[in-house]
């Protein structure tokens, strides 16, 4: 059993055309610097197209985003990640206000008045530790990670450690957004 890193309250508001979601969390005393804070959605694999309004159109992180324009971008989910020899996180997009995943006939959208980061991937980040070498097998699902906060990449391997402003150090974190599922 894994002990939660945060005490949190998750609220849903059901409307005619959307579900409003708000999350408030307080970090537990023993937690230092988690890699990210957000929610994970598991969708059917057929949600394989992504359109978003945010930084892009390549992966970016809080400390690796400043040369990229905020605009509207479209990608295949399978093309939004980099396959490293040693499995690790990739494909994050920052400063987003909207992300939509599409199947042939449906759309799953997240819209927020506040910037968030997201990752759309056929891999579950929880599986990375199980593999010492490149992950060949995908989940058979589309995973959508919505992050209120995420840690920067840094350069500790060959330079200075990650600056504190790019770490998840907040004692309390809030995020809110609307979920919309509709026909395409």
PLM feature segments, named:
Residues 1-184:
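Beta-strand/loop-rich accessory regions of lumenal/periplasmic or secreted enzymes
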């Amino acid at each position: 059993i894994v002990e939660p890193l945060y005490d949190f309250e998750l609220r849903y508001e059901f409307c005619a055309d959307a579900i409003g979601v708000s999350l408030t969390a307080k970090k537990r005393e023993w937690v230092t610097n988690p890699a990210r804070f957000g929610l994970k959605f598991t969708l059917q694999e057929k949600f394989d197209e992504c359109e978003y309004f945010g930084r892009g159109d390549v992966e970016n992180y809080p400390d690796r985003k400043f040369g990229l324009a905020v605009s509207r971008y479209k990608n295949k989910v399978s093309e939004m990640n980099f396959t490293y020899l040693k499995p690790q996180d990739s494909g994050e997009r920052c400063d987003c206000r909207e992300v939509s995943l599409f199947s042939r006939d449906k759309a799953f959208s997240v819209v927020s008045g506040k910037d968030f980061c997201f990752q759309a991937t056929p891999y579950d980040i929880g599986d990375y530790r199980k593999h010492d070498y490149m992950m060949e097998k995908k989940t058979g699902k589309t995973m959508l990670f919505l992050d209120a906060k995420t840690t920067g990449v840094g350069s500790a391997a060959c330079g200075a450690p990650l600056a504190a402003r790019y770490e998840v150090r907040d004692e309390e974190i809030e995020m809110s957004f609307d979920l919309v599922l509709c026909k395409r």
